[in-house]
C-alpha cells in the first residue's frame, strides 16, 4: 500500500498546538520508484510523469470508492489532474460520496496542468464548484505566487511551498512583496506546505498564515 496521509493543520497565536483541519491523501512517488524502477528518475521526463500521475489518480479514486476506512470518508484532500476530473472514474467517485461529504473534500491541482489547457480547467472547475468541492492550487513557490489571481481563477486555497531561500532577505523587500501578494489572495486561503522546521512556521506567521503542512507539523 503506497497511499500516505499528512494532516493540514491550523496554528494560531492563541493555540500554537497544531489542530488538524483535513488530511491530504497521496501515493508516495518515491516509494513507488523504489519498488518498481529503483534506477530510473521518474521526474526526468515531465510528460511521462504526468501520464504516470494520471494512472495513479485512477488508482486513488478506486481506493476511495471501495474504502471501508471511515477516517478518509471526509475532510480529505487529493491531488488530481484536470483530465482525471473529466473522466468517468471521477464521476463514479463523486457518486460514491454522501452529499454532505463533498464540501469537506479539497481537490488539489498543479499549475502546469491548469495553464496547459485553461479551457479544460475552467470546465472542470465549474463542475467541481457545482458539486460542492473545494479547489486548491498546489505547488506554488514565492516567485509564482505573485502571478496568481486566486479569485479570478476560482481557487479556494493556495498551497505555498516553503524553502529556506524565502527567508534569505536582508533588505526585507521580498518579505514585504510576498505579504502584499498573500494579503491580495487572502491570508486565510494560504497553506504553507513542506514545513520542515520551526523557521518555516515562523516565516508563515510573518505572512499572516495560520495553516501549515509538513514533517515539522507532523
Predicted regions and their residues:
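Bacterial c-di-GMP phosphodiesterase EAL domain
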Residues: 1-99
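Acidic-and-aromatic substrate-binding clefts and catalytic sites of carbohydrate-active enzymes
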Residues: 54, 83-89, 113-117, 165-169
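Flexible, charged surface loops at secondary-structure boundaries
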Residues: 66-72, 99-101, 129-130, 151-154, ...
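EAL-family c-di-GMP phosphodiesterase catalytic domain
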Residues: 1, 6-7, 29-32, 110-114, ...
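Structural preference for beta-strand elements that scaffold enzyme active sites
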Residues: 22-24, 75-79, 104-108, 132-136, ...
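Catalytic-core regions built around general acid/base machinery
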Residues: 93-100, 123-131, 177-182
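Short, solvent-exposed linear motifs at loop/edge-of-secondary-structure regions
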Residues: 99-115
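Distinct, well-ordered alpha-helical segments
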Residues: 86-98, 117-125, 144-157, 204
